[in-house]
UniProtKB/Swiss-Prot annotation:
PROSITE patterns found in the cross-reference section: CRESS_DNA_REP
Sequence motif RCR-2, residues: 61-63
Motif (Nuclear localization signal): 279-289
Function, in words: Essential for the replication of viral ssDNA. The closed circular ssDNA genome is first converted to a superhelical dsDNA. Rep binds a specific region at the genome origin of replication. It introduces an endonucleolytic nick within the conserved sequence 5'-TAATATTAC-3' in the intergenic region of the genome present in all geminiviruses, thereby initiating the rolling circle replication (RCR). Following cleavage, binds covalently to the 5'-phosphate of DNA as a tyrosyl ester. The cleavage gives rise to a free 3'-OH that serves as a primer for the cellular DNA polymerase.
SUPFAM superfamilies: Origin of replication-binding domain, RBD-like (SSF55464), P-loop containing nucleoside triphosphate hydrolases (SSF52540)
Intervals of motif RCR-1: 19-22
Top-rank lineage group of the source organism: Viruses
Gene Ontology terms describing biological process: DNA replication
Designated name of the protein: Replication-associated protein
Cofactors named for this entry: Mg(2+); Mn(2+)
Subcellular location: Host nucleus
Amino acid sequence: MPSAPQKTKSFRLQTKYVFLTYPRCSSSAENLRDFLWDKLSRFAIFFIAIATELHQDGTPHLHCLIQLDKRSNIRDPSFFDLEGNHPNIQPAKNSEQVLEYISKDGNVITKGEFKKHRVSPSKSDERWRTIIQTATSKEEYLDMIKDEFPHEWATKLQWLEYSANKLFPPQPEIYQATFTEEDLQCHEDLQLWRDQHLYHEPRRAGTRIPSLYICGPSRTGKTTWARSLGRHNYWNGTIDFTVYDDHATYNVIDDIPFKFVPLWKQLIGCQSDFTVNPKYGKKKKIKGGVPCIILCNDDEDWLKNMSPAQIEYFEANCITHFMYAAETFFAPESSSH
């Protein structure tokens, strides 16, 4: 019995190579060959092969490979229907494989001259591949995409930034201290923390050292002192793990309210190997295992915004220092800023 036409509202066939299957077809292979050759003459058909295969119940179905010189643009799903027989329609991605498949039983008729065909990567793929292989930096990569694919650049920049960061991982900038050790001073409690926990011999694996919390007035040199102690990750305003230096010996959290610090227990508790979710990026594991120096002013005192349980954890993992009146981190002879 003839099969019903495909029901689709958006059918479109654009290809030079077509593979059709007519299940339980009532038409002969010869009639189908002549019908399709005439029907596809406007697309400069140059080869057709039709194979007859019998079902177990004895009814035939026909396989058909078509090769065109001009690219088809067919929107009517009933275009290939013959005598009430409607085929399954799909592009032939590899004409040689399709011809081999339909010829397995040997019952094949052909017309025209067969040409080997295999779908090659699209021009778009080739252009993307060239960009990926030739760009030497994130900036050059994005500039090349902007020139070649302006629509993608305008509408998918967030994802392109992500792929750029995968190809060219951001390298952390090493902070260069603007003040020398002689220009700075610190309270003896802070000096003790620095010397015992930061300037120390490599500690035994699995041990954790306390973080440091400094709360006090603005423009007293807290940030300058904290950033002068060695290689570190620095966050101001927000915590962003996009660029994280695994070789840093400590982190600085500067003027960020407690409620905006994600994974604060992992950070303050000097925990190792925890997972973060960077902005515009996928989750990744952070090496961690280094203490934090938390800096804030009196109006953003973290302890005022913590529950009793949070305070208990915080004080067990962090040394707190509230600056006294007139305390400064600048040595008397240095100029403050």
